[in-house]
Amino acid sequence: MPNKVKINLEKVSRVFAGPSGERIEALRDVSLEVEEAYTPEGRDVGEFRVLLGPSGCGKSTILRLIAGLDFPDSGKVEVNGKTVEGPGRDRGMVFQKYTSFPWLNVADNIAYGLTIQGAPAAQKKETVAKLVEAVGLSGFEKSYPDRLSGGMQQRVAIARTLAVRPEVILMDEPFGALDAQTRGDMQALLLHIWDETACTVLFVTHDVEEAVYLADRIFILSARPGTIVEDVPVALGRPRDPAMKQTKEFHDLQDYVLACLRRAPGTGHVRVGV
């Protein structure tokens, strides 16, 4: 059974107006594909793809275009073979900034999308119960965001996204503001959830170690105007284990990705890891 193209961008460009009216070219002729594969048993398995590049290279803009929160000046953006015309239930997004509603507790934040969709109370209760356990927030259902750590707030954000069962999860540096230990815990949680749900993930980072550890393949972007300069396969086995970060295979791949970044036009600072 041939693989299915889940996300497709063809020659996408995006230009913004600067504060003084100057032309800021964020993306230029970006083309990429993210596929959905099939196991021998016929199960759909979404790819885990990473967008890696220096700050300001347009990674977040790509996610916003796929999410339907912004639109290209030229080119084509498709999900499941259909042109993206706005946000949809098939896509969910997790941001770096904490996005929990401060007036809602954990359970109600997780159920927010279902509430908007008019889901029955019984469905919301069952979904929240499963997700609270899945993301390790049991006992915090009635807590409010100001009582949660950064890692816990991102667990809420992931659970809220999963509650509406999207086919594609778009993640914009969701662990960038977390300390190293919490970031490692969240990476492990994300990989577990991805394995369980088999959804497609497109994850933005400027951390090379994080990219190599999480991804099936890595799209490497140049500095602004961002364009795809490399598509690097990550030939590491799954499930991933933190111990593999100490292996020669991992370090060789990390060095290769870093070299690709340094060869890319105009690239500056990227984080290698901690």
Pin down the residues of each PLM region:
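Conserved ABC transporter NBD signature motif
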Residues: 75-86
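Signature (C-motif/LSGGQ) region and adjacent switch/coupling loops
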Residues: 87, 107, 133, 141-144
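Catalytic Walker B motif of ABC-type/P-loop ATPase nucleotide-binding domains
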Residues: 169-172
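Conserved ABC ATPase "signature" region
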Residues: 111, 115, 120-140, 192
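Conserved signature/switch motifs of ABC ATPase nucleotide-binding domains
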Residues: 143-146, 164
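Helix-to-loop junction immediately C-terminal to a conserved catalytic motif
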Residues: 67
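Short coil-to-helix segment of the ABC ATPase nucleotide-binding domain corresponding to the Q-loop/switch region
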Residues: 104-112
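Hydrophobic anchor residue at the start of the ABC signature
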Residues: 158
